[in-house]
A protein has these predicted regions:
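Secretory targeting signatures
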Residues: 1-48, 521, 539
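Conserved beta-strand positions in repeat-built beta-propeller and related beta-rich domains
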Residues: 100-106, 139-141, 155-161, 195-204, ...
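Beta-propeller fold detector
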Residues: 59-62, 78-81, 120-127, 175-179, ...
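Long beta-sheet-rich domains in secretory-pathway and surface-associated proteins
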Residues: 432-539
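A short helix->beta-strand "capping" segment at the edge of beta-propeller domains
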Residues: 62-86
Length: 539
């Protein structure tokens, strides 16, 4: 395994492209089989096997290789097509001017030089699905996380085949470590450069002592059991690991477990110094898919719920949860009209250099940036759409999602993400100014069945024309449920330097439970939106 891998250098201008996709964190193959079985033609007679294979490969290419072979772009996002066909990139990391990613089909560790516009790709020594035909299900091997260690010398990445890999940039050698986690997914380094990681099909936390690990062995790895009393009565096959984040300042590791079908999720706080789980947080049933996890500058835990349109903050000092939501899923995803059961599915969260929290909206086809101080959400539209991953009407010319699967943020708040459906990586340039900001009151209070007027001031830093937007934590899909909200004006056009106050009248439904909710109010256009959170106290 220590032999130097095959290396390829490819100019950006000479790429061939075919494109690809995904739907969830575990049952990808099952989804593909189900979708294919609904759409594959019935074939019988001589040559049936060959024709079936051809039909299945064609369907696979339509769903997992996409149809948009050229990179797309908008004001903020610019895509880059990968050099090989059907690479299926997922995990990604940024190292200065280099962007690293893993091809889950081809078994390649790739790097893109953002200054030169060139690729290097290194063949991972062992990747069983590399040689499988597209007609095999699955014909890929997931690599969810790519990390660069503190020295900047090594690239680490997970491999669903119970493996973690390390690539040395200087020697161009790979080391392979067999780990006790089943289907390793997320990993992070502690302040000493050691590894903590989880496996999708494991219900434990795992530790890797980097000074003791040995190539080709499981030496130096240990399992840290998590108390599972909260999942009593649930089959272990249904309990999976969600997310992980290491708190280097406080020497803690936060982990989430979930049983999605049972709408059950928990957060665990593990103290590195005492080697004990010191806190277990039972999540409400409407937050049963805690996946992405990150810490803000104050030690609060932020979690993306990959079963709804919700992301939330857990405050350890107050032991409470505050919910926020994305915008409602765009009708562009569905060819003109958003169905009532459409969710944006926030997936992973990472913190930018300025403390802002980034997350990818898996089925919302957006990248979100949330300011935890201002409680302001900016969402950036991803310009590619694969119609095979939405219920698109035949007449729709624009429909689908790009399946943005993982992302990384550099210190300057530039973000790179992978598009598993499109065989592309993409850069989001957050240094470009968003054309508007929104000012709202911090909170309002009203009784059930009553109405209140909320003043929303839209301030333009450049010319802007768009639509007013509202969403709320009343429903899992960010809709208002039986409550209602009406803007005094649905459209807004502003010249640079101007502002406009628009009224939003919110009426709480008669049977709404007392408590605190959040409404997100703002405006957006085809490329970007800006929304502010308003606390709504139902008394």
């Amino acid at each position: 395994l220590s032999d130097s891998p095959r290396k390829k250098t490819t100019p950006q201008s000479s790429k061939k492209i075919i494109t690809y996709a995904i739907i969830g964190i575990v049952a990808v193959a099952a989804v593909y089989v189900a979708m294919f079985s609904r759409s594959a033609p019935e074939i019988s007679g001589p040559g049936t096997n060959t024709q079936n294979d051809e039909a299945m490969q064609q369907r696979f290419e339509e769903q997992f290789c996409g149809t948009q072979t050229a990179p797309n772009s908008n004001t903020y996002v610019a895509e880059v097509a990968l050099p090989a066909e059907c690479e299926m990139p997922v995990g990604i990391a940024i190292d200065g001017a280099k962007v690293w990613y893993v091809s889950t089909k081809r078994g390649l560790l790739g790097s893109y030089d953002t200054a030169a516009g060139t690729f290097n790709e290194y063949e991972i020594p062992s990747w069983p699905t590399r040689s499988l035909p597209f007609t095999s299900v699955p014909s890929w091997s997931m690599s969810w996380t790519v990390k660069i260690d503190g020295r900047g010398e090594n690239i680490w990445f997970t491999d669903q085949n119970n493996t973690i890999w390390r690539f040395n940039q200087s020697t161009e050698d790979f080391d392979m470590f067999k780990v006790p986690a089943k289907y390793p997914s997320m990993m992070d380094f502690d302040s000493n450069g050691n590894l903590y990681f989880i496996g999708i099909n494991s219900q434990s936390l795992f530790f890797g002592n980097v000074s003791r690990i040995q190539n080709g062995t499981s030496e130096g790895f240990a399992e840290i059991s998590l108390p599972l009393e909260g999942f009593s009565g649930v089959s272990s096959d249904l309990v999976t690991s969600g997310g992980l984040v290491v708190d280097k300042e406080r020497s803690d590791v936060w982990v989430s477990l979930l049983a999605f079908q049972q709408k059950k999720g928990q957060l665990f706080q593990y103290d590195i110094e005492t080697n004990k789980v010191v806190r277990i947080v039972d999540l409400p049933t409407d937050l049963g898919a805690p996946v992405g996890m990150e810490l803000d500058n104050y030690g609060n835990v932020w979690v993306a719920d990959h079963g709804t349109s919700t992301f939330f903050r857990y405050d350890p000092s107050m032991d409470n949860i505050t919910r926020f939501v994305t915008s409602i899923a765009s009708p562009k995803i569905y060819g003109g009209s958003t169905p009532p059961n459409a969710y944006t599915l926030p997936y992973w969260i990472d913190k930018g250099g300025d403390g802002s929290l980034w997350f990818n909206e898996h089925t919302g086809n957006k990248i979100g940036r949330f300011d935890p101080e201002e409680l302001a959400l900016v969402e950036y539209w991803i310009p590619s759409q694969n119609r095979a991953w939405a219920l698109c009407p035949p007449e729709a010319t624009v429909c689908g999602i790009a399946n943005a699967m993982q992302f990384a943020v550099d210190p300057e708040n530039h973000l790179w993400f992978t598009e598993w459906t499109e065989n592309k990586i993409a850069k989001l340039d957050a240094s470009k100014q968003v054309p508007i900001a929104v000012v709202t009151p911090a909170e309002v209070a009203l009784a059930r069945g009553e109405s209140t007027e909320i003043k929303v001031t839209v301030v333009a830093s450049s010319d802007f024309s768009g639509q007013m937007m509202a969403s709320g934590t009343f429903m899992p899909n960010a809709a208002l449920g039986n409550s209602t909200g009406i803007f005094s004006e649905e459209s807004v056009s502003l010249s640079s330097g101007s502002s406009k106050e628009i009224s939003y009248t919110f009426t709480a439904e008669q049977d709404l439970k007392q408590g605190q909710y959040t409404i997100m109010l703002g405006a957006g256009n085809d490329d970007v939106s800006y929304m502010k959170a308003v606390r709504v106290n139902i008394i």
